[in-house]
Every structure is written in C-alpha cells, then in structure tokens.
Amino acid sequence: MKKHLLPLALLFSGISPAQALDVGDISSFMNSDSSTLSKTIQNSTDSGRLINIRLERLSSPLDDGQVIAMDKPDELLLTPASLLLPAQASEVIRFFYKGPADEKERYYRIVWFDQALSDAQRDNANRSAVATASARIGTILVVAPRQANYHFQYANGSLTNTGNATLRILAYGPCLKAANGKECKENYYLMPGKSRRFTHVDTADNKGRVALWQGDKFIPVK
C-alpha cells in the first residue's frame, strides 16, 4: 500500500494481490468540509486489466459491520466505475458524496474487481477460468459527518472519543517496556464512542507525548 498504517482502532480489511492492482490506502477519509475524494490506482503488471468498482454502505467498518441500504440512490457516486487499465498505467478514481448533511458518520466499502484483460475477453465457454485469475479487493471509505463535533477525553494513557467523527490518535516517546527499545510510537484510528489505551509508549513520562488529528487539524493532548 502507498501509505503504511500502524495497527488501527478501526479493523479495516483488504486484500492486495501481489503484482496486480494497487488501490492505494486500505482506508480513506473524506473530511467534513469536503464532498469529493480522489484515489489513484495503478496497474503494476505487464498486461492490461479490466477494473470494475462497486460501492456498499456499511453499518460499521469493524468486523461485525453489515451491508445496509443507502439513504438515497445517489448518496455516493464515483467515476469511472469501469475501465480498462493498460500495463504499467494509473488512473484517478473520483468519489462524490451527495448524502445527508447531518451529524452521522458514514462508512462505505469500495469493492474493486480486477481481472487480467486476456481473461475478460474469453468467450463464455471459458468463463470458469476468469474467477481463478481475478481478484476482489475491499477498501474502506469513511465520510465524516457534515456537522462534525470533535470531542475527546484523556486520562492515564487512555483516549476516549466522545464526539461524532473518527479521530486519528498518536503517542510517541520513551517505550513503556525496555525490551521494545528507547523510543516508541503508536498510531490508531478511534471511532466515536470508542476508547484506546496506549500500550507501547510511556505516556506518564514527561517526555511522552499524545496528540490527535481532527480532520486536517493537529491537536496536542499531552
């Protein structure tokens, strides 16, 4: 993936087949002050790929999240939804949020269907071969509430998100355990209503630091 994400409070999932389609970050965020998002995908192989993209709304990005109905048919749009991607080429996929401007955070699964162009062009008699040569990749898009309320509580090395939008939280400084070295860093996503305790950084130390991101705004906590 293009951006390394440390263990997340959000348990996002996705599969990126080796030497195939690179869809970038497993998790993407559309901040409350934006209604568009662009993702660049890349075909790192030496053959063309047929890419089809589908959107699903989820009740939660966690493992127990279920597919649910969108509030309206054009709640989230994308373009292009289908494309032929030449070898070693890239393409920008754009997403447009047109849903309710309320206080609710929304979660979507972007499903990328990727298959070698030679397989896609086979006749129906050989369609059974397509499934084994194809890949289904799932990534997550989080759309922050249009009316975001950022609130949190911090005490004794634990952060609680008391607002209505996911926070990116981090801690860095002396390691809590000597076996982990001298300096440690932790980086998580924290959903509304969830708490997270830092377990690698000694946040009680004077040199231990805790901070978070509210959208694009950096907030020192300790």
Swiss-Prot record:
The signal peptide here is 1-20
Q: Does the keyword Chaperone apply?
A: yes
Q: Give induction info.
A: Negatively regulated by H-NS. Positively regulated by IHF and EcpR.
Which InterPro entries does this one have?
A: EcpB_C, Ig-like_fold, PapD-like_sf
Consequences of knocking out this gene: Mutants do not express ECP and are defective in biofilm formation.
Which keywords does the record carry?
Chaperone, Fimbrium biogenesis, Signal
Its function, per the record, reads: Part of the ecpRABCDE operon, which encodes the E.coli common pilus (ECP). ECP is found in both commensal and pathogenic strains and plays a dual role in early-stage biofilm development and host cell recognition.
Similarity annotation: Belongs to the EcpB/EcpE family.
The entry's protein name is: Probable fimbrial chaperone EcpB
Gene coding for it: ecpB
